[in-house]
Amino acid sequence: MKNFAGVAKHLDTTGEALQQAYATALQANPQLSRGQFLKACVLERNLKPKKPAVTTQAILDGLASGKTVDQTLESLGLTGSEAQAADSAAQSQVTLYAQEA
């Protein structure tokens, strides 16, 4: 719960709501890690204003189909270098936010 609370503050939600959303996503994809889920949420927040197709659900669907985050972002309209940069930035943000709880 601790790392959900830290990330939740930056996503305008609660740790409980984020944890419940993760539990729901985990039912759809039992292989999904907490880190992948949190990164998908941060990616939506970072990218959706300019790339409306980038949603948490679209990223989770890509992961469930066996794609990497980068591959999923590319399929949603980002270039390879944009996808790598966005993935790396989101990972750094999740790591930082999780420590704030």
Go through the PLM ranges and name each one.
Residues M1-A101:
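Mature extracellular/secreted ectodomains of secretory-pathway proteins
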